């Protein structure tokens, strides 16, 4: 019997998020935490991309000429601001329902984005290449994190950047991100996150290194209930972001 082909897709996760697809653009709906989280993600991406590629972050379109992949893009909450910053954006998601919602919203907003109902491995097999890959709140939902990071890294141009945001596997994260957010406060539907699939920073950085990427920066992200805002922090016990670079041939000599 031939060996089953490895896949990054967890069918249960795809089904779970497909069922919530109509909620993506409701800032007070089931994805409210993601809407609140978006400003700190955007600032981290904008500042690091501008510094790396020598762009002015205050310019109207600082990402002009850059090709970005938002893998696991959901309804397009990151794709649209990336496009407005001037990037050529491909938004990919395993859920065709999510992609339909994202396409409709982009059309209504007058934003040009190339949305595809594709997996990371399918895009990599097509030979796609990008300057920047956004891998935000996705790795804790895939079936095979090593394969997922490997396929994403294949699509990154030398000198390109990959941003990863996820949740640490700690008791603190269990209490706040799962029990607190899903069962007590009900900010997220129950079952959105599974503790065993959360990813520690050392595990993520090991997967990035195995795929040939160099970790350049890491930061925690914490929620302040008094201001109802997320902020960067040294505390990586719950939410955190990592920035990695694919070295150029010259850098590897």
From Swiss-Prot:
Pfam families: Methyltransf_23 (PF13489). One of its GO terms (biological process) is methylation. Pathway: Cofactor biosynthesis; ubiquinone biosynthesis. Its EC number is 2.1.1.222, 2.1.1.64. Belongs to the methyltransferase superfamily. UbiG/COQ3 family. InterPro entries: SAM-dependent_MTases_sf (IPR029063), UbiG_MeTrfase (IPR010233). It catalyses: a 3-demethylubiquinol + S-adenosyl-L-methionine = a ubiquinol + S-adenosyl-L-homocysteine + H(+); a 3-(all-trans-polyprenyl)benzene-1,2-diol + S-adenosyl-L-methionine = a 2-methoxy-6-(all-trans-polyprenyl)phenol + S-adenosyl-L-homocysteine + H(+). HAMAP family: UbiG. The gene is ubiG. This is Ubiquinone biosynthesis O-methyltransferase. SUPFAM superfamilies: S-adenosyl-L-methionine-dependent methyltransferases (SSF53335). GO terms for molecular function: 2-polyprenyl-6-hydroxyphenol methylase activity; 3-demethylubiquinol 3-O-methyltransferase activity; polyprenyldihydroxybenzoate methyltransferase activity. The lineage of its organism: Bacteria, Pseudomonadati, Pseudomonadota, Alphaproteobacteria, Hyphomicrobiales. Keywords: Methyltransferase, S-adenosyl-L-methionine, Transferase, Ubiquinone biosynthesis. S-adenosyl-L-methionine binds at residues 41, 72, 93, 136. O-methyltransferase that catalyzes the 2 O-methylation steps in the ubiquinone biosynthetic pathway.
């Amino acid at each position: 019997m031939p060996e089953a082909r490895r896949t990054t897709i967890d069918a249960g996760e795809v089904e779970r998020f497909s069922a919530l697809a109509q909620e993506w653009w409701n800032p007070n709906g089931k994805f409210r935490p993601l809407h609140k989280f978006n400003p700190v993600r955007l600032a981290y991406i904008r500042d690091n991309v501008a510094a790396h590629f020598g762009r002015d972050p205050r310019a109207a379109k600082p990402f002009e000429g850059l090709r970005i992949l938002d893998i696991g893009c959901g309804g397009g909450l990151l794709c649209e601001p990336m496009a407005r910053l001037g990037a050529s954006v491909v938004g990919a998601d395993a859920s065709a329902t999510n992609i339909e919602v994202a396409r409709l919203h982009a059309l209504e907003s007058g934003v040009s984005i190339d949305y595809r109902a594709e997996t990371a491995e399918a895009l990599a097999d097509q030979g796609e290449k990008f300057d920047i890959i956004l891998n935000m709140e996705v790795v804790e939902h895939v079936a095979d994190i090593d394969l997922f990071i490997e396929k994403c890294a294949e699509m990154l141009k030398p000198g390109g950047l990959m941003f990863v945001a996820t949740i640490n596997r700690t008791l603190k994260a269990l209490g706040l991100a799962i029990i607190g957010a899903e069962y007590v406060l009900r900010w997220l539907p129950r079952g959105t996150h599974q503790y065993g699939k959360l990813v520690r920073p050392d595990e993520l950085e090991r997967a990035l290194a195995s795929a040939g990427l160099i970790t350049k920066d890491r930061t925690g992200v914490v929620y302040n209930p008094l201001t109802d805002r997320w902020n960067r922090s040294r505390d990586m016990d719950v939410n955190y972001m990592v920035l990695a670079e694919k070295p150029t041939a010259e850098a590897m000599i």
